[in-house]
Amino acid sequence: MSSMTPREIVHELDKHIVGQQDAKRAVAIALRNRWRRMQLPADMRSEVTPKNILMIGPTGVGKTEIARRLAKLANAPFIKVEATKFTEVGYVGRDVESIIRDLVDVAIKLRREQAMKAVQYRAAEAAEERILDVLLPPARDTSEEESKHESSTRQIFRKKLREGQLDDKEIEIDVAAASVGVEIMAPPGMEEMTSQLQNMFSSLGRERTKKTKMTVKKAFKQLQDEEAAKLVSEEDIKTQALETVEQNGIVFIDEIDKVARRGNVSGADVSREGVQRDLLPLIEGCTVSTKHGMVKTDHILFITSGAFHLSKPSDLIPELQGRLPIRVELQALTPDDFERILTEPKASLTEQQQALLKTEGVDIQFTQDGIRRIAETAFDVNERTENIGARRLHTILERLLEDVSFDAGNDTSSIRIDGAYVDAHLGELAKNEDLSRYIL
């Protein structure tokens, strides 16, 4: 679990996301509260439940990006799902409990990586010995003199191995045979049975090994992974992963507005109100059965987000609204925001384009007025057509640099992208509403 303070979390998010300070502060406080809760005595800890969040804002302003970056910072089991993927129990589609099953799988993978990292040094030593056994097979019935000589030869080879002098040498080693891959098409709601059958089939022949030729460098990596897997306990990993999911798990549900009842629409809302009602016990706290054991969802943090351009947060069923007490509104982007998005974030869009074309020897320079014109064009097109937020910048940059990208590689050159260049390449398209609707 990350022990970063809210200010540090916001500072990290600022490196990648422009503006939206309210949303950043809300998720930073929620993440820090997870850490604070873990410092409490056990009896008090069980009483403190997370305050779930609803992020509201137009598309392309940073809701999903905040979730992506938060996942990297959290150092806790984190899963992002779209609400539109799920349907009411009994209908074709995934039921909402599969969110928790997927979260458990993520936690086990995370815990296994941590456990294997902890035994990496011992695994490397064991892998080294196995490679030396292949390079210098131990002789039978050797005298004391011969065994001393063999030991000194082994040390010479060990030194060469550690220095990388034997990396390209090809050897034949015994590696664990790949498990049998079985794909089972199961009806909705039967994922549990499917996973159990897949586990049963994959365990067949797990103990078998096969001889494989590979370089010492590849063999060392493979043997190290094998040895690390022997040193860690799968049972402990599962137990700790389930505990981590219950105490620190975070679920991000995107497109929550798409399952809200829209105004005066009548008819069966299979994938709407039913999904909301199925989400209620999950968010409130219930016990979900997974193939690894039972998981209580009482202390899992749920962050939901939606554009709400065809519906309103009040269109969600009242019970669900009550379980999302923290509301954060994200602001629509201005030309100044677009300008900052092009230059400020780590690995910004302009830096990415410069780096890509530099591989072909093309040097691109964006001037300040060029960046301003790109930002203004993106804002204008968003205002006159569909507002897709910062995603519009991708479309405009690709269109602007289309000719440069096509001719790159034929000759090395330096291109200066200023206001005049942007107007020459995008001016007519941006002004013509019919064309910009389809091309930009």
UniProtKB/Swiss-Prot annotation:
GO biological process, one term: protein unfolding
SMART domains xrefs: AAA, ClpB_D2-small
List of residues binding ATP: 18, 60-65, 254, 319, 391
CDD domains referenced in this protein's UniProt entry, alphabetically: RecA-like_HslU (cd19498)
Keyword DNA damage: no
Keywords: ATP-binding, Chaperone, Cytoplasm, Nucleotide-binding, Stress response
Subcellular location as annotated: Cytoplasm
GO CC, alphabetical: HslUV protease complex
Family as reported in the entry's similarity comment: Belongs to the ClpX chaperone family. HslU subfamily.
Function: ATPase subunit of a proteasome-like degradation complex; this subunit has chaperone activity. The binding of ATP and its subsequent hydrolysis by HslU are essential for unfolding of protein substrates subsequently hydrolyzed by HslV. HslU recognizes the N-terminal part of its protein substrates and unfolds these before they are guided to HslV for hydrolysis.
Protein name: ATP-dependent protease ATPase subunit HslU
Gene giving rise to this polypeptide: hslU
